[in-house]
């Protein structure tokens, strides 16, 4: 997760909204599940009010709405992500980067994985877990429609 998050932040310099960062990581996870048959990272997403949120990523952002990427200490992600994974993230980022965080939020809240998980409001919402299987199923449906 940290490698994915750092690579996306680096591409969004100088500022990225936490919402946009969360949603792009969600799209990376969903497409990776469908195309490669396994998750990009182990962490789970939860159905929060404005769409999928990975609590661990939320903690990395310190709960801030905006992240000044110039104040973030960047690390070399190559030990965490091989070339294939880095390229995969860059491709998904390229598709979804033109959208705002709110637009991405609207898209993700139309997914069954979000609708069926319940809607939590904070990291302690146990009933809001979006299973990787339900995310996978949503992205299979999306892939079949394109």
PLM features: what roles do these ranges have?
Residues 4-5, 9-146:
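Domain-edge interaction signal
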């Amino acid at each position: 997760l940290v490698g994915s998050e750092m690579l996306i932040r680096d591409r969004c310099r100088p500022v990225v909204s936490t919402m946009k960062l969360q949603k792009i990581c969600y799209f990376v996870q969903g497409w990776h599940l469908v195309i490669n048959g396994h998750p990009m990272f182990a962490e789970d997403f939860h159905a929060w009010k404005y769409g999928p949120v990975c609590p661990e990523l939320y903690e990395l952002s310190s709960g801030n709405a905006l992240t000044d990427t110039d104040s973030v200490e960047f690390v070399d992600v190559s030990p965490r992500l091989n070339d294939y994974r880095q390229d995969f993230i860059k491709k998904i980022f390229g598709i979804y980067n033109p959208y705002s965080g709110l637009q991405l939020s609207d898209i993700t809240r139309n997914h069954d994985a979000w609708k069926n998980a319940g809607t939590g409001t904070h990291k302690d919402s146990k009933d809001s877990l979006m299973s990787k299987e339900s995310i996978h199923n949503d992205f299979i449906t999306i892939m079949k429609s394109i």
